[in-house]
């Protein structure tokens, strides 16, 4: 599963999706468990690489994924409720997403500027595309946590401007890892092993190196089938603060922007 969706991981900072407004003609729009759900109808004449799920079925899949989180992942729901206290939490089904130029199967992505409603409240927006609507609900639930909780909480805490992309993704992957634990997916399956390797050996590699150097007693938080995500996140906060203060994060972000990897 994870090998198919790696394309989603940097879209929230580097892509420029079509900007929707509060007047966007959603064919379906409703509030579900405090979340604003909206579906965009397929534009006439548009040809896609796969047949998108019918809007009603796509919305039902989103609700099923949300229900799974409410039943099984109070850790994730508490974070979503934090976002709800600060603004509007929006999940949009857009069958046109992603555009064909993106490689891989992009399931969902967090776009801070995808949808702008009237007023000054923050919008925490995750877009689920035509692939994501067909994804199994349990896996989709964890991807929603990655995008909405992981990247949404980063915006809530003001981290998007001073944390390197690799570290933003590390944090989002940690939230996703915790969701997989809560949902009860088989952590010894081939796909979960691939996910764990991507988490540890790619996105969180430099963070884990920092942990070994500066917090050796915390290495044990990783060394189990189900890593202690809340404990790891406490160490992570120290790590990103070190990078902010010593200027390493700013230098990396400047390079990302010069290379067009970040807005």
Name each region found by the language model.
Residues 1-6:
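Bacterial N-terminal signal peptides that target proteins for export
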Residues 7-18:
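Bacterial N-terminal signal peptides
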Residues 20-23:
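Boundary at the C-terminal end of the N-terminal hydrophobic targeting segment
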Residues 41-122:
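Auxiliary, metal-adjacent structural segments of Zn-dependent hydrolase domains
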Residues 127-144:
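Short pre-active-site segment immediately N-terminal to the catalytic Zn-binding motif
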Residues 142-155:
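Active-site recognition of the HExxH zinc-binding catalytic motif
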Residues 163-196:
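Post-HExxH zinc-binding segment in Zn-dependent metallohydrolases
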Residues 183-263:
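Long, well-structured alpha-helical subdomains associated
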């Amino acid at each position: 599963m994870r090998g198919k969706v790696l394309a989603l991981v940097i879209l929230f900072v580097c892509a420029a999706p079509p900007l929707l407004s509060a007047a966007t003609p959603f064919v379906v729009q409703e509030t579900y468990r405090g979340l604003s759900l909206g579906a965009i109808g397929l534009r006439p004449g548009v040809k896609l690489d796969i047949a998108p799920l019918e809007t009603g079925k796509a919305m039902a899949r989103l609700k099923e994924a949300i229900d799974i989180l409410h039943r099984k992942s109070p850790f994730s729901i508490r974070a979503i409720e934090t976002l709800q206290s600060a603004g509007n939490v929006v999940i949009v089904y857009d069958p046109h997403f992603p555009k064909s130029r993106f490689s891989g199967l992009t399931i969902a992505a967090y776009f801070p500027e995808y949808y702008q409603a009237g007023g000054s409240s923050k919008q925490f927006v995750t877009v689920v595309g035509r692939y994501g609507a067909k994804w199994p609900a349990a896996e989709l639930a964890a991807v929603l946590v990655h995008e909405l909780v992981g990247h949404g909480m980063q915006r809530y805490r003001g981290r998007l401007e001073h944390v390197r992309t690799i570290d933003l993704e590390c944090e989002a992957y940690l939230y996703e890892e915790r969701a997989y634990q809560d949902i009860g997916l088989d952590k010894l399956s081939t796909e979960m092993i691939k996910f764990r390797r991507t988490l540890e050996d790619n996105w969180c590699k430099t963070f884990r190196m920092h942990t070994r150097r500066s917090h050796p007693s915390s290495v044990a938080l990783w060394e189990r089938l189900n890593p202690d995500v809340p404990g790891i996140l406490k160490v992570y906060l120290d790590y990103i603060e070190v990078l902010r203060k010593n200027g390493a994060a700013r230098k990396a972000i400047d390079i990302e922007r010069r290379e067009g990897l970040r807005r």
